[in-house]
Amino acid sequence: MLYSKLIKKTFYNYFFACIILLFYFSEAVSKYYLYYHSHKLNLPKNIKIVIIFLLFFYLIYQKKTKIMIKLLLLLSLFIVGQLSLNYDLLNVEKITIIAKYLFPIFFLNSAYLIFKKGKKQPFFKVFEYVIIFNSILLIIGFLFNVKLFKTYTHRFGFNGLFITSATSTYFYIIAIFYLFMKNKKSYYFYFLSAITLVSSVIVGTKSIFLFLMLLILFISFYKINKKHRIKAMIFAVVIISILAALFFIFEPSYLNFIKERGLLTAILSYRDELFLKETLPFINNNWSIINYFSGGINNVLNRSQLGLIDLFLTLGLVGSIVYLYFFYKSLVKGKINKEFMFFIVSLIIIISLGGNFFFSSTIVIYLVVIQQIFIKNNDSVNG
């Protein structure tokens, strides 16, 4: 009996702390093999499959049928859309697509249930250690031009051991907001904040620069006393100008790119062209009225890599609204304050301009940080 209680306590306290390490280091190993052996390992995928089964059986054991009903509803909408197309329904690629979209809702709800019975601190602490470890590698990569740690092969950017630019982008956006909400006065916190901000700039993605600019504006408007708001706004303009200058210093060819391809294509990194050449023709040639409500996709090549448009392509208008509602309720538990409203709005803006947020099964583990810091913040306000 005592042994059983100890196992349960360990599970609730450390399960998600272990998952962060497994997700991070499995992708790190995969990036190493991809770079040095031109071979992508299935290790990250296999780990995620095992975790899905563990969490699935946990939900069944806890008799949490509401989560399953939500997933089945979204799956049903997807199937309706697919049946309206003249393509095979039971296609491995299509199953993978909908599975990736369902995973965040499944994972966030599972995390919420487990953390209700466990401690958050080990999870937060491991997250901070990953920030420090990856940031040190990232800065070393920047200083010594270590190609393994690069974000892109063709332009500036270093992301440490993250395998994709999307994962590193959202990881550092979440890390910045996590530290903004934590806001402790200690040498460790100052070090963690400094190394996170420096690393965020070195990652070199437009989404991180955009988030930093939005955060600076938010602080200037809502966190600074009215008497000092004008000074704060001037300071914000200066900082934003510095960030913009840094971006163009690191990417000197970007201005030429804007002149050649246009501002929209530069901001969206060719995603507007993908939409016009792949997504829109597919919709025009294959969709019926039903598909506008429940979506319909043939393969990943139809995607524009614009988050909200790809969601609409997969689940249609009704499916997208239902999905976003379920996603929001999975992430935000309780009364939302202006800080978290800022994060949600910023996230929507960034997702609208970029891709792979909903489609990445790795980003969701770091979203659990946002979910739990939100709950912790609510508990401190109410308690």
Can you say where each PLM-predicted feature lies in the sequence?
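Long extracytoplasmic/lumenal interhelical loops at the membrane interface
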Residues: 34, 148, 254-315
